[in-house]
Amino acid sequence: MLLLAGLGNPGPQYQNHRHNVGFMAADAIFRRHSFSPWSKKFSALVAEGRVGTEKLLLVKPQTFMNLSGQAVGEAMRFYKLQPSDIIVFYDELDLAPGKVRVKRGSGSGGHNGIKSIDAHCGQDYRRVRIGIGHPGDKARVTPHVLGDFAKADHAWLDPLLDAMAENVDLLITGDESGFMNKASLAVQGKAADIEMAGEKPAQKGRSHIRQARPKAPPAELPSSGPMAAMLKKLFGGKE
């Protein structure tokens, strides 16, 4: 059995927050594959199912983000699982919107839900980091993370969630590169480019550096002297 945990905050007021994209991933997997109805257990919503030959337990902690490890740890111990049997889906500020990266172990990157799981389960589990982008200013991080996805975001978010759900078999069988590739293809050309504030886009085919250079004035040809005589011989001239 593998335990797939999606992180977020419980309650309808949080359901569209960027911080809840882990819940959204779990919901997409639930819809795409055959699972039992959600039930309350381990301070979480849980559903059992199977993808291919692998039995799965979907977990959505209902403890609020900062205590996610309580629910995941309790489920891990109940089913006598190891940290290596756990896959966690969560939001990542330091990835551009629509980017997905899978890694095993390492630090929390400042994510409180991951800190909590590290404390209760150790660090040797796989993390599916789902990019939500950084607002660019530290003071805007909290309202960004705890804000709803914009309507325009669904152009990349919906196909991304669908692709992760459809290809979760690649993830559970260890083909992490294949899973990330499918996720990348799903959002190709759909995630909006983020322009630097106040910077106008370059004209097609010209770099910003090239545009910044002033045009050099045309060279003036000498009208008298030896050089003028030589040029006149080479190119001719009006008499």
From Swiss-Prot:
Record-level GO BP terms: protein quality control for misfolded or incompletely synthesized proteins; rescue of stalled ribosome
Listed GO CC annotations: cytoplasm
Basic residues biased stretches: 203-213
EC number in record: 3.1.1.29
GO molecular function, one term: peptidyl-tRNA hydrolase activity
Annotated site, Stabilizes the basic form of H active site to accept a proton, chain positions: D91
Site residues, Discriminates between blocked and unblocked aminoacyl-tRNA: N9
Catalysed reaction equations from the record: an N-acyl-L-alpha-aminoacyl-tRNA + H2O = an N-acyl-L-amino acid + a tRNA + H(+)
InterPro entries recorded: Pept_tRNA_hydro (IPR001328), Pept_tRNA_hydro_CS (IPR018171), Pept_tRNA_hydro_sf (IPR036416)
Active site, UniProt feature: H19
Top-level taxon of the source organism: Bacteria
Binding sites annotated in the UniProt record for tRNA: Y14, F64, N66, N112
Region (Disordered): 199-227
Subcellular location per the Swiss-Prot or TrEMBL entry: Cytoplasm
Subunit structure of this chain's protein: Monomer.
HAMAP family: Pept_tRNA_hydro_bact
Family designation: Belongs to the PTH family.
Protein name (Swiss-Prot/TrEMBL): Peptidyl-tRNA hydrolase
